[in-house]
Amino acid sequence: YVSATAGTKLSVPLITSADINAPHKQVTIQEIYDFMIKDVKEAIEQGLPEQSRTVIHPNLGAAYAFLARVYLQMANYEEALKYADMALEQNDTLYDWISYYNSHKEAITKEDSYPSLPSATGYDYVENYYFRCGEGNPNYATSELNIPVERAESFEGGDARFLSRWKLRTVNQDTYYQGLAKGYFNGAGLTTCEVYLIKAECLARQVTGNDFSAAMDVLNKVRKTRILPEIYQPLQASTLTEAIDLIRRTKDNELIFTIVPFADARRFNAEGTFARALSKTWEGQTYTLTPASHLWIMPFPAGAVQNPGNGTITQNVSK
């Protein structure tokens, strides 16, 4: 979302009918954002309950959390902060990952042992506003995905959440961090941790001097439930760049395997100030994804463009 072009650049076809033959229109980015916001606000007005029937049914906290996420993507930090606070009024609980790690420490630290631990982030995860499995299957338990060594290096030292979920392993010529957890994973839902980190960024964005303590207090509140006490030190920032970097590190790691780090990266790239190039070396060759690369954009399948049904679809990339 870029406000200067949102009213003219096309997004996706907006389909509001269950009729397979209903006509559709490819709307602008502004129109699709307006539709999402209007839809959620209407649901709130119509009486979304504070407590939903199940965690896979949205409740009031989920609606507020979703609006906070959407407004953050629009760089509307005032509204994002407003709805983040409203979501936290519904649920502000953070999971104690330090206690989880300590409960399973013996199994985790046992040499040459890669135990199957119960996922803490399933349907009953206390941070859930709304649960969706993401890449997992809602009908049966799945295993935590492995991560490469270079990805693991971005986690803070002493991160109990990381230590509880991955363990370094070498098999033949491959060294990687093996996923330990098995169960259900809220990979596409909404959680209190994300909302705290949205709030932290919004508070940082509103600073006019160099006092980022309010934003750092929110970030550190999350970290206190993650970083082992013998290693934990409160983070401080004296510039917006420092604050954003610290918040982004925690958020990228907390929401690994979700769409959020990707969406945030595109948002920061569009803004320019906090844009990053991503590089990876594979078999002696270094590949770099620049902030302006067309590869950040997911093109429509050729079949959809050529046969769009009862409407038209304009391709969103030129390459």
Where are these regions (language model features)?
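Surface-exposed patches in mature extracellular/periplasmic domains of secreted proteins
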Residues: P49-L60, P234
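Aromatic-anchored glycine-rich loop motif in surface-exposed flexible loops
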Residues: Y1-R53
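Extended, hydrophobic/aromatic-rich amphipathic alpha-helical segments that build helical scaffolds
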Residues: Y1-A4, Y33-I44, I56-L88, G187-K221, ...
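Hydrophobic-face positions in mid-chain alpha helices that act as interaction patches
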Residues: I15, H57, A75, L81-C193, ...
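Short, glycine- and charge-enriched coil/turn segments that flank and shape catalytic ligand pockets
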Residues: T208-G209, Q236-S238
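General structural signal for alpha-helix termini and helix-helix connectors
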Residues: P49, R205, L228-Y232
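Flavin (FAD/FMN) cofactor-binding core of flavoprotein oxidoreductases
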Residues: K224-R226
